[in-house]
Structure formats: structure tokens, C-alpha cells
Design a protein with these regions (language model features):
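Polytopic alpha-helical membrane proteins, predominantly small-molecule transporters/carriers
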Residues: 1-364
Length: 364
């Protein structure tokens, strides 16, 4: 029996994706503890920790000979994964700007929504597996889960627009200091679509994963060498941009100036990177649990991030003083997001059951 089959567990896969979504929703919180540093300075530390240190340490800890695997991998596949990561890097740079203008709840709802739709539906089509999206009970259920998650995202977005119309600027800016819906919406659209490059990259390293398995890595951790390459592409963009801003804004001294809590800043900025990277570690380790329905993992990851980020937004007061209608839209949207994850988990169960079923008797 195939090793991957032995590890298939759709319910556990959905839970792992959901934990990744939680990490994606809260990674920004440690930045609030960074004192007297420019954005580019703490984002640089975040990038070094989350895009370089964590993935490489994890790859060497969980994978058999990751360097050897990457040396044997097709150069074209490595380049594509790297470039997809760089595409994400361009989108990821504006993720923080999106949150600055829209707040955690609304910003991640719109950005993750576009990222979810693009990153879930496009990879199977590019790989010539369009038929995987429909035709069997498990595929139909998984597609239904994706559609429901997108419906939930739309409702959360509608609730956000309703909130934007209802609240006076002073209340909105009390919760989100630089609130600007128009700027935020434009940034979120760009960031969401470009950030889907992460999904393309993480799902585009099949040969690398096969080599990792052949080297003796378990099915659960076979994707770590792919993660390293994709995040390296993202790091390149983030590093160059932050370095440019450090030079332009004369903030290179942030890393050494004595009047700031240097150790605390390094710890909290680095912690944000570690938490952020955790969502994609969860994505790659959850994939093998889903079997043939692994492509829906991106939708579950994004839906979970929106669910948890919206709940965090509620906790932070971003939805305070809104109308019953707005809160109702928000509540229904959150229920749909939660329900989509349940349906996606059930789709994996259907797929597992269909494979376990004995073939029908053939009449002579």
C-alpha cells in the first residue's frame, strides 16, 4: 500500500489546516510590541526568521537530506517554485498595508477571499486535473465546500462594507488608526491575488516531494524542501524592499540604536515570522492527510484565517457599534466559513470510503 494512503486522515487534515489559519490570523499581533522601529526594520527581522530560519531548521529536522533532494530536483521546477514564492512576496509586502487601512477582520476577509478563490481553483486546472473538481461524490462535496467558503467570504466582506457606511470616522479610526476603505480595498485586491502565488508554489513541487519520499522522508514532512524554495523566493523580494526602505529612510540604525529595546524588538518581530510560517507548515503537513482532495486545503486554510481574524477583530472592537443587520451578515458569513470546513472534511471522508469500497462483482 502507498505510504500516502496509510497517512490519509481527512478530519485530521482539516484540523491541521484550521490551526494554520489560526496562525495566519494572529501572526501580526507580536508586531504591536515592537517599539521605536520603522516598519521596514521589524518586517526585515520577520522575514529572516519566518522565511529563512524556520523553514531551513524544520527541513533539516524533519527531512532526509534536503540539500541532496534539491540537487536532484528538476531545475525548472525549482525555478517555478522560487518565482511563485517571489510573486507571493510582492503580494505579501502589501498584506501589512492592507491591515493598516482596513483592520485585521475586514482586511484579511477580502485579501484571503481573493487568495482562496485563486489559489484553490487555479492549480488543479494548470496541472490538467480539472476533472478532480467535480464528477465524484467527494469531488462534488469538496467543490461545494469551496463555494460555501467563498459565499461566507462575500458575506463577511458585505458586513465590512456595511460597517464602513455606518460608523463615523472617529470610531473607525479608534479601532484602526489609519482606516481608509478605498485605499484598503485596492491594496487587498492586489495583495490577495498576488499572494495566491504561495499556493501555486507549494502545490507545484511534486517531483521534489517524490524525491524527498524516495530519500526516506515521511509523507507528512515530504513538502518541507518545497517550502524552503518557495519561501526563499518570498524572502528575496521582502529583503530587497526592506533594505531599500532602510537606506531610503535612513533607518539602518534601528538594528543597533541603544534607545530602543533591541532584544525585545528582535524577539517579537522574529516571533511574528515564526507564527506566520506556521500556517504554511500546517498546509504542507495537512496535505497528505487529504489524499486526492489535497487541493481544497488552501480554501480551508484561508477560510480558517478569515474566521479567526474576524473573531479577533470582534475582540479588538472593530465591529463595535455596528447595526443588527451588519452583525447578522457577519454572523452568517462566519457560520458559512465554519460549515465549509466541515463539508471539506466530509469530502475527504467520502473519498477515503470510495477507495476502501471493494469493486462491484462482474456478471459473467
Amino acid at each position: 500500500m502507498d505510504t500516502a494512503q496509510l497517512t490519509t486522515n481527512p478530519a485530521l487534515g482539516v484540523l491541521i489546516f484550521a490551526l494554520g489559519g489560526l496562525a495566519g490570523a494572529v501572526f501580526y499581533i507580536p508586531f504591536k510590541k515592537v517599539k521605536n522601529w520603522a516598519w521596514e526594520s521589524y518586517w526585515m527581522i520577520y522575514a529572516v526568521a519566518g522565511l529563512v530560519l524556520v523553514p531551513w531548521v524544520l527541513a533539516f529536522s524533519t527531512s532526509a537530506d534536503p540539500i541532496g533532494v534539491l540537487k536532484k530536483a528538476p531545475s525548472g521546477e525549482i525555478l517555478r517554485c522560487y518565482l511563485y514564492g517571489a510573486t507571493w512576496g510582492v503580494g505579501g509586502l502589501t498584506w501589512g498595508l492592507m491591515i493598516r487601512y482596513l483592520g485585521v477582520g475586514l482586511g484579511l476577509a477580502i485579501g484571503c477571499g481573493l487568495c482562496s478563490a485563486t489559489g484553490t481553483l487555479i492549480p488543479p486546472i494548470l496541472e490538467g486535473r480539472f476533472h478532480d473538481l467535480y464528477g465524484t461524490p467527494s469531488a462534488n462535496a469538496s467543490l461545494l465546500g469551496v463555494v460555501i467558503s467563498l459565499a461566507g467570504i462575500v458575506l463577511v466582506g458585505m458586513a465590512g462594507m456595511s460597517k464602513e457606511k455606518e460608523l463615523p470616522d472617529e470610531i473607525k479610526k479608534k479601532a484602526v488608526a489609519e482606516y481608509n476603505f478605498t485605499k484598503g480595498l485596492l491594496v487587498a485586491c492586489f495583495s490577495g491575488i498576488m499572494s495566491a502565488g504561495m499556493s501555486f508554489g507549494l502545490q507545484g513541487g511534486k517531483n521534489i516531494e517524490s524525491l524527498s519520499l524516495a530519500a526516506g522522508t515521511s509523507a507528512t514532512w515530504k513538502g518541507m524542501p518545497v517550502l524552503v524554495i518557495v519561501l526563499l523566493g518570498g524572502f528575496t523580494i521582502n529583503f530587497l524592499w526592506c533594505l531599500y526602505l532602510n537606506i531610503k529612510n535612513k533607518t539602518l540604525g534601528d538594528y543597533v540604536k541603544p534607545q530602543t529595546p533591541l532584544l525585545g524588538n528582535l524577539i517579537f518581530a522574529g516571533l511574528a515570522g515564526v507564527i506566520w510560517c506556521s500556517q504554511f507548515i500546517c498546509f504542507k503537513t495537512g496535505e497528505p492527510k487529504m489524499g486526492d482532495m489535497a487541493y481544497v486545503g488552501w480554501a480551508v486554510l484561508m477560510a480558517s484565517a478569515i474566521l479567526f481574524s474576524t473573531l479577533l477583530g470582534i475582540f479588538l472592537g472593530e465591529w463595535k457599534s455596528t447595526s443588527v443587520r451588519t452583525r447578522s451578515l457577519l454572523a452568517v458569513g462566519l457560520v458559512l466559513l465554519l460549515g465549509s470546513s466541515v463539508i471539506t472534511g466530509y469530502s475527504g471522508y467520502l473519498g477515503k470510503q470510495s477507495k476502501a469500497a471493494p469493486p462491484a462483482d462482474v456478471k459473467q
